[in-house]
Regions:
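Conserved NTP phosphate-binding and transfer environment spanning the P-loop NTPase/kinase superfamily
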Residues: 307, 430-575
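Hydrophobic anchor at the beta1->P-loop junction of P-loop NTPases
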Residues: 313-315
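Conserved nucleotide-sensing/catalytic segment adjacent to the nucleotide-binding pocket
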Residues: 355-397
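Hydrophobic positions on the alpha1 helix immediately C-terminal to the Walker A/P-loop
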Residues: 326, 330
Length: 575
């Protein structure tokens, strides 16, 4: 076995492929059956997924016995293969990683001396920034990039994955000028590393990829100062490239997050680990918490400056953004300025189950805005702002209906804080004049990369938060949380993201220390997922992100930190 593994390292093949070759030589294979497109065929020898599905380039990858597999994956036992296209959610990470490889290769070919970095969150696209001093992207660069990408796609060059030792990978990356990729290898726990080769260009995108460049044909490139936007098909857009939507309010927050990360040296995982090693746990935690304190101070000042008009403070954001902790900390910030807000829960305005609209599957759509009593909420808010005494509802989740709640009368100088996924939806507060509303959108906006070509996914960050929180407070397994995540995401695209540009302020709830803290909580939950489980590839992807972070103990995380909302120990748990 040791000799076999040595052979694997020497010739760049993974262990499964070695076994396939050995079995081929020894003639040890039994016949097996593969079901594809409702047709079952018998095979005498191992085949790749590509051999089965054919050369239809709309097929990006496939489920093999419910597991997402690349098209070059070898099948050697009874299996069911279901093709995945750009319309499918599980094909998106593989296509997006392949597209980043294509862009990096094209830029290397036409501008070999330029250093580039990819990041996310501009109109659901890839943002490419030029890192070289005094070099900025422009229209000519966009044209050159498009032409080279088209040439590579038409050439249909194979992308071949190799497994090499970490030492060999470090030599390759150093030779190719990728010092950032070499540095991150020091934090990789495995003794080997993966590298993809395409016509002599070598890189790795921390994901499996398509078999050849001909599969990466759908994209759109545009100039977007100070870099370049690469748009690509999205499953929520039915496999099409969604229209570009500029988001200046949201963009300012992203730019600010990037500036902070760059200024503190925390724009890469290596930078974060080095900062922890240099400053120590307590100083680094305090540094990260101070970023939230500054934002809260800014918000408090803005609301204080407009206190004569502002009566309703609306807080919304996607799942696991830290809305509960944020709302409580904002309340304390305002109290320190002599402003005494009162909180009202939008959850108390749910309709009964038989009144809730249904989704396309005929199930109650509890995330729809029409699942709330919009008219009653508007009337109650308008009456409270007018100084009237109001009988508020209280939703009894055991009874599944509203019951009478507290009676409330709000002084004219006392703002109301409402928090919920629909808090920024104009329908919920249509009876309140715009000048009396202050809207806040909250979401984690990490501008951190594994290396220059591999940004951390903000969606995966929120999924990690939710996995840890659901296990901590609801006893849910990682499988439970991952299984319901697509439904959560669907609701976010439908109801939440369209409201973010209407916000007066976007609060970045990401704490640079959080992944170093949550690692110890999340890793055991993810590692418990069996390799044969359909959600294993997602767990594997999250582990790939977490494993590079140095651990930090929970001890010094403040009780009012947003991180505490997920790992436990928050002073606001009963608030």
């Amino acid at each position: 076995m040791r000799a076999c593994k040595l052979l694997m390292l020497l010739i760049g093949l993974d262990f499964a492929t070695i076994l396939v070759r050995v079995c081929e030589i020894g003639g040890q294979y039994m016949s097996f059956q593969i079901t594809f497109n409702n047709e079952t065929k018998t095979y005498e020898n191992p085949v790749t997924v590509l051999d089965v599905v054919g050369k239809d380039k709309s097929i990006i990858c496939a489920y093999v016995n419910k597991r997402v597999r690349e098209l070059t994956y070898t099948v050697d036992k009874d299996s069911e293969i279901i093709p995945l296209t750009l319309k499918d959610r599980d094909a998106k990470p593989l296509y997006e990683a392949s597209l980043r490889f294509l862009v990096a290769m094209a830029m290397h070919n036409i501008y070999p001396d330029l250093k580039i970095r990819f990041s996310y969150n501009v109109s659901r696209s890839i943002f490419m920034q030029i890192l070289n001093p005094h070099v900025c992207s422009n229209g000519m660069m966009v044209r050159d990039l498009q032409e080279e990408m088209k040439r590579l796609v038409e050439a249909d060059l194979p992308l071949v994955r190799h497994i090499v030792s970490k030492e060999e990978a470090a030599k390759i990356f150093q030779k190719d000028g990728y010092e950032d990729k070499k540095e991150i290898l020091a934090y990789r726990p495995e003794k080997t590393a993966h590298i993809y080769d395409c016509n002599g260009y070598r890189n790795y995108m921390y994901n499996r990829m398509v078999p050849s460049t001909g599969y990466i044909a759908k994209w759109r490139v545009r100039y977007y100062h100070p870099g370049i936007i690469i748009q690509y098909p999205r499953p929520e857009a039915n496999g099409e490239i969604p229209p570009f939507e500029d988001a200046p309010t949201f963009g300012k927050t992203l730019k600010r997050a990037h500036q902070w990360a760059k200024a503190t040296g925390c724009d890469t995982i290596v930078g974060i680990n080095k900062r922890i090693e240099k400053d120590g746990d307590i100083d680094f935690i305090t540094l990260c918490e101070q970023k939230h304190n500054r934002q809260l101070c800014e918000l408090g000042q803005m609301i204080e400056d407009g206190r004569e008009d502002i009566r309703l403070i609306c807080i919304a954001g996607p799942s696991s953004s830290g809305k509960t902790t944020f709302a409580n900390r904002l309340r304390i910030e305002l109290l320190s300025r002599g402003i005494e807000p009162i909180r009202i829960s939008m959850d108390d305005y749910y309709l009964t189950k038989d009144e809730v609209p249904v989704d396309e599957d005929g199930k109650p759509d509890l995330e729809a805005v029409d699942a709330l009593d919009i008219e009653l909420f508007n009337n109650n808010m308008a009456d409270l702002i007018a100084g009237l005494e109001v009988q508020l509802p209280k939703f009894d989740f055991k009874l599944g209906k509203r019951v009478p709640g507290r009676v409330l009368q709000v002084p004219i100088d006392q703002p109301i804080i409402i928090e919920g996924i629909h808090a920024l939806n104009e329908r919920m507060t249509s009876s309140i004049p715009s000048h009396q509303k202050f809207k806040i959108f909250i979401a984690p906006q990490a501008q951190v990369n594994i290396d220059d070509h591999n940004p951390l996914s903000l969606t995966d960050l929120r999924l990690l938060r939710r996995i840890v929180r659901d296990y901590q407070f609801r006893g849910a397994s990682a499988l439970d949380t991952i299984g319901m995540w697509p439904s959560v995401r669907k609701g976010e695209f439908k109801w939440i993201y369209g409201t973010q540009e209407g916000a007066n302020y976007v609060f970045n709830s990401f704490s640079t220390v959080e992944l170093s803290v949550m690692k110890k909580h999340a890793m055991p939950l993810l590692e418990a997922i069996d390799m044969d489980n359909e959600y294993f590839p997602i767990a594997e992807r999250l582990i790939r992100m977490l494993k590079f972070f140095d651990d930090i103990p929970d001890t010094w995380i403040p009780c009012n930190s947003i991180i505490r909302e997920f790992i436990g120990g928050s002073c606001y748990e009963d608030a």
